[in-house]
Amino acid sequence: MHCERFICILRIIGTTLFGVSLLLGISAAYIVGYQFIQTDNYYFSFGLYGAILALHLIIQSLFAFLEHRKMKRSLETPIKLNKSVALCIAAYQEDEDYLRKCLLSVKRLTYPGMKVIMVIDGNSDDDLYMMNIFREIMGNDSCATYVWKNNFHMKGPNETDETHRESMQHVTQMVLSNRNVCIMQKWNGKREVMYTAFKALGRSVDYVQVCDSDTVLDPASSVEMVKVLEEDIMVGGVGGDVQILNKYDSWISFLSSVRYWMAFNIERACQSYFGCVQCISGPLGMYRNSLLHEFIEDWYNQEFLGSQCSFGDDRHLTNRVLSLGYATKYTARSKCLTETPTEYLRWLNQQTRWSKSYFREWLYNSLWFHKHHLWMTYEAVITGFFPFFLIATVIQLFYRGRIWNILLFLLTVQLVGLIKSSFASALRGNIVMVFMSFYSVLYMSSLLPAKMFAIATINKAGWGTSGRKTIVVNFIGLIPITVWFTILLGGVCYTIWRETKKPFSESEKIVLAVGAILYACYWVMLLTMYVSLVMKCGRRRKEPQHDLVLA
């Protein structure tokens, strides 16, 4: 016991020193600004900080590639399908078409004897259509439904403690006694919905799969995740490859689709190589049920700065698994399609909410760095502090740099995006990934200020992604974007005013002309490809897209 405690202390000290040293090293490289290569007048330069970021991308891509090779080899691994699995679907104001597609895909799952529990966040007449769809798809004779006036933590009107306790027992018994169950309960957010499913199931099953009501599951998705959990008893949770169902509905959903592929098949695949996936996504994940019941109450009652957390449910669930010392994995062999916002404002609200949960969970996650591979510490430092370095770089360039410095920065952003997207195109075998370089502009213009706004309002839970039947009318997410563009525009105007006081030399004029032409040509080429390739593919929107999961 004393030996284990001593080793634990050493690991805490080691990971802390490693993380602090890494952050100080990167900060020093950024502040000193040592340049490996530079031309006269600093038309072009490549420094130590840039080399660190480039090395990170190379290492990340390498381990992602190695993890994908391991996934392919696991195809031949035989498993016994004798473990009990329950699928928990969280539903809230869902679009009828998406919900039907979700439930139809659930019926096609190949894992035998799977229990299905759909919990609806809301018990009003306006929510009843979701229960009716459940009955229609799953069959009236083979499912049990219940409209609950309350939930596990809130009483209904005029209800006593005794009747509340009886209703909880009724819900639990119904879940245990039936294979397909749909429950409508008093509204209290997604975490309440998930808690109901987990609590009612108890320890009656081996594995619990989670799913959102806008998700279309691949028939083999459950089998593939069970395979990962069966291969290693120290794996506590596993996530699958989440792709976009409505990717051709708008430019924002299309860019989200290429970003999703990168996030799962590069970033999470790399994390999976070291057994420390930071977030098992809500549309497609599976956990050991025995672990869930070790922390279900702490997970539900999570607080931050004195307030109970109402978002980031899936990320915190993953963090709870990591806190016990269990590994979390990703498998590209388990796939699903899910809906993503098609409107800019809804997307921005979603990203801000996700950024809030990321930074909040980053702090919680840091408590368990010592229980996992050093890569977990390394990546947390790199990705956690990168936005701050980037903002400092942009402001410095726009207010202290020259015109060609700003132009060079814009070209560099696109070049890095193009290199990363080219590797993704080769790995995926699909040229569509080249549009990932498009996403870099969206990141710089919208995600970066949204992240800063998320930190400033991290304890505010009053807005986020709304139900799909709700029109987004909250424009507060545009505030940081407006401030950010004002800062950038001010920098450009200031730089131009300063440059007019000193005539450009011939070499400066050439650099500006060539750079501007290259940048313009790049965008013309990319936009032409988008119109010719993506708009043509958009005609497939009317096809039954649940069949595209295997693509």
From Swiss-Prot:
Which parts of the sequence lie on the Extracellular side of the lipid bilayer?
33-45, 396-402, 451-470, 531-551
Which class of enzymes does this protein belong to? transferase
Tell me the route in metabolism or biology where this protein functions: Glycan biosynthesis; hyaluronan biosynthesis
Gene3D superfamilies attached here? Answer: Spore Coat Polysaccharide Biosynthesis Protein SpsA, Chain A (3.90.550.10)
An example Gene Ontology cellular component term from the record? Answer: Golgi apparatus
Q: Which GO terms describe its biological process?
A: atrioventricular canal development; endocardial cushion to mesenchymal transition; extracellular matrix assembly; hyaluronan biosynthetic process; polysaccharide biosynthetic process; positive regulation of urine volume; renal water absorption; vasculogenesis
TM region positions: 12-32, 46-66, 375-395, 403-423, 430-450, 471-491, 510-530
Tell me where in or outside the cell this protein is found: Cell membrane; Endoplasmic reticulum membrane; Vesicle; Golgi apparatus membrane
Q: How does it assemble?
A: Homodimer; dimerization promotes enzymatic activity.
Q: What is this protein called?
A: Hyaluronan synthase 2
Query: Which organism encodes this protein?
Result: Xenopus laevis (African clawed frog)
Supply the source organism's classification. Eukaryota, Metazoa, Chordata, Craniata, Vertebrata
